[in-house]
Amino acid sequence: MPSLLLWTGLGNPEPGMALQRHNIGFMAVDAIAQRHGFTPWRNRFKGLTAEGTLAGRKIILLKPMTYMNASGESVQPATAFFKLPPEAVSAFHDELDLAPGKVRVKRGGGAAGHNGLRSMDRMLGTPEYWRVRLGIGHPGSKERVHGHVLGNFAKSDQEWLGPLLEAVADAAPLLAEGRAEDFMTRIALLTHRQ
């Protein structure tokens, strides 16, 4: 397990987009930074970075300010600067194919239509980084996907969204240790979602 990890939250930088489902990746890294006393966010690598330590490993949190479709243009210079292999990189992102509040971690795989992941794959030259898939649910039909991901979380979503972000922050040290299964289990226990 590398001693330095880059955790990227995927989202869009416009203030008016902050509460959209597509921005749950930003929300997750914000929760981690706040819970674990990371440094204040600062401008770097066409994004915002915050630094801290979890489980004895240095973590760089990154929020690309490039818009979702160009996320790789922020992630690539950060990985090059720190000389990071793909396995040291994780992308926290919204996942249509998981029920709201469910979390799955995997390494590699396809972009599944997610433009942020597609941009990272292209700019990093490999899909072999980690993905922390944060379930937002599927609207039911392909035609409604665009409006769903770019829509704000509904009031009813708050009952699972807040606890989920708290649980991700709470379990983050397990992820830093490379214990993806334990990270997922801890979140499921904390949110009562198996």
From Swiss-Prot:
InterPro entries given in the database record: Pept_tRNA_hydro (IPR001328), Pept_tRNA_hydro_CS (IPR018171), Pept_tRNA_hydro_sf (IPR036416)
SUPFAM superfamilies reported for this sequence: Peptidyl-tRNA hydrolase-like
Record bears the keyword Cell wall biogenesis/degradation: no
Reaction it catalyzes: an N-acyl-L-alpha-aminoacyl-tRNA + H2O = an N-acyl-L-amino acid + a tRNA + H(+)
Keyword terms, alphabetized: Cytoplasm, Hydrolase, RNA-binding, tRNA-binding
Record site: Discriminates between blocked and unblocked aminoacyl-tRNA: N12
GO CC list: cytoplasm
Principal place of residence: cytoplasm
E.C. numbers: 3.1.1.29
Alphabetical GO biological process terms: protein quality control for misfolded or incompletely synthesized proteins; rescue of stalled ribosome
Catalytic residues in the record: H22
UniProt binding sites for tRNA: Y67, N69, N115
Subcellular location: Cytoplasm
GO function term, MF aspect, one: peptidyl-tRNA hydrolase activity
Keyword Magnesium listed: no
Stabilizes the basic form of H active site to accept a proton (site feature) positions: D94
Tree of life domain: Bacteria
Stored PANTHER family: PEPTIDYL-TRNA HYDROLASE
Functional description taken from the UniProt entry: Hydrolyzes ribosome-free peptidyl-tRNAs (with 1 or more amino acids incorporated), which drop off the ribosome during protein synthesis, or as a result of ribosome stalling.
Family: Belongs to the PTH family.
Name this protein carries in UniProt: Peptidyl-tRNA hydrolase
Originating species: Granulibacter bethesdensis (strain ATCC BAA-1260 / CGDNIH1)
